[in-house]
C-alpha cells in the first residue's frame, strides 16, 4: 500500500486541469534538467495554450498550496516534496491507462535456476543500473528454509564432509574429524529420513526427538550460526554521481540504514514510496525510497529497497521496481516447488 498523505490528495482536488498540467510540466522539467522552471519554459515544452501571465498566476496558486517554491526573487520554481508526490501519483494513473512499458530487462529472464544468491545479485545490480539508485535486498532467512538432503562424504580415514542442502539451492558445508569407523551411509540415510522436509528452524528448536543431545544437532547449529550478511547491496556509486546529493547526505543514509527497525518501518503492503519528509528522518529529506517484498507463494521471504534522489524518474522507476519484485517472487515460488 502506498504511503499517501491525505492532505496532499485533497489539496490536489483544488486544482483545475490547466493547473495540474502546469504542475506536472514543472516537476517533469525539473527532474530532467535540475534547474528552476519559469512560466516561459512551461509554455515552450508543453501544449498549454494560455498566456505567460495566466501560467504565472497558476504558479502562484501552486506555490500557495505548497506544490512548488521559488528559491529567490525572479527565479523559476522548484517542486516541493508535495509536488513530487503529485507527480508520482499522476504517473501511476497514466501507467494504468497505457500498456506496460517494454523495459530493458530481458537479461533477467535467463536468470540461473539453481543459485538464489546469483539471482539476488543479478536483481540488485539490474535494479541499481536501471533506476540509478542504491539498492538493498534482504536475503531469505536461513531458518525458514526446508532441508532437501543431508550428505556425509568421507574424504579420508579421519575426515568426512557434512553438508546440508536446502530449498533454493542454499547449502552449508563443514568438515568433521572422525575418531571411529561407522557406517556413514546408514547414518546419512537415517538423517535424511529424520530431516528431509523439515525447516532448519524446526530442527534447531529441538522438534526432532532423535537428534536431541546429538553431535549432529550441534553441527547444524554451528553451520547455521555462521555469519551471513542479511542484505546485499548495489549501486552506491549512483548516489555518489548524483549532483543533487552531497557526500554528507550519502553518509547520513548509510548510517540510517544500519537501523533494522527503520528499514522495516519503510515497508507496507505492495510497493511503498516515501518522498523527502515522508521518510520521517530530517537528514534524509533529499531522498526518495521505494520498498516492497518478494514472496515464496503467499509468504513474504525478503524485502527490497532502493534509495535515490527525490528528483527522479518516478514513472519509470516504479515500473522497473514492480517488475523486479514480481520476477523474484516467481523465481522463489517456482524453485520451492521443484
From Swiss-Prot:
Alphabetically ordered keywords of this record: Repressor, Stress response, Transcription, Transcription regulation
Annotated transmembrane regions: none
Molecular function per GO: DNA binding
A Pfam family reported for this protein in Swiss-Prot or TrEMBL: HrcA
GO biological process, one term: negative regulation of DNA-templated transcription
InterPro entries the UniProt entry points to: GAF-like_dom_sf (IPR029016), HrcA (IPR002571), HrcA_C (IPR021153), WH-like_DNA-bd_sf (IPR036388), WH_DNA-bd_sf (IPR036390), WHTH_transcript_rep_HrcA_IDD (IPR023120)
Its biological purpose: Negative regulator of class I heat shock genes (grpE-dnaK-dnaJ and groELS operons). Prevents heat-shock induction of these operons.
UniProt-listed HAMAP family: HrcA (MF_00081)
The family this protein is said to belong to: Belongs to the HrcA family.
Descriptive protein name: Heat-inducible transcription repressor HrcA
Encoding gene (name): hrcA
